[in-house]
Amino acid sequence: WNLNQEDIYKIILDRGEGKISKDGAMVVKTGIHTGRSAQDKFVVKESNNKDSIWWDNAKEMSEENFDLLYSDMIEFSDNKDLFVQDLFGGADLEYRLPTRIYTEYAWHSLFIQNLLITVKEEEKSKFDPEFVIIDMPSFKANPARHGSRSETIIAVNFDKKIVLIAGTSYAGEIKKSVFTMLNFLLPPKNVMPMHCSVNVGSDDDSAIFFGLSGTGKTTLSA
């Protein structure tokens, strides 16, 4: 639970999940999915979101199918060692999202710990997760049982603030799930989420870089 990077590195190596490169970076394989599975993402349609989501670009999922998937994944995890990280999505104290992430793979725990904001020691006793992600790459969804398109599924329930990820080892799904929840929660608070990077000039003027993933936003802002 909330292991530090050194301990996670050791577990990754002991379990054969990855190798360390000559530069000290952890190298892993994501399996058949080398990117996000946008066609396998489903959203539970409910009264609180039916008018606020662009459904032409989102697949609907019934609450019954979501609950069944949830219970099946919990049962599947009974005899597994899971890794848990309590983290914040966002840096602003007023708008950050307390998030708890359960992962089947140690390297997924390392990945998301690197991307989100660690809970400070003095904050741990009061940490109360508002959002939960359960990430089980080796669990295979059943289209007939769960209403999925394939064995891979990313199931989003905005009402319960839970995301279920199954059938994919691509860790970027975890990161995107945090963005998805923030994109839903922040606009009603008059905050506009943006997929961008920022740098600051010598006169304290700022520049914002927009672009699709991998187009160089972070490089330009570094």
Model-derived regions: residue spans:
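A noncatalytic interaction/capping subdomain that flanks phosphate/NTP-handling catalytic cores
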Residues: 1-206
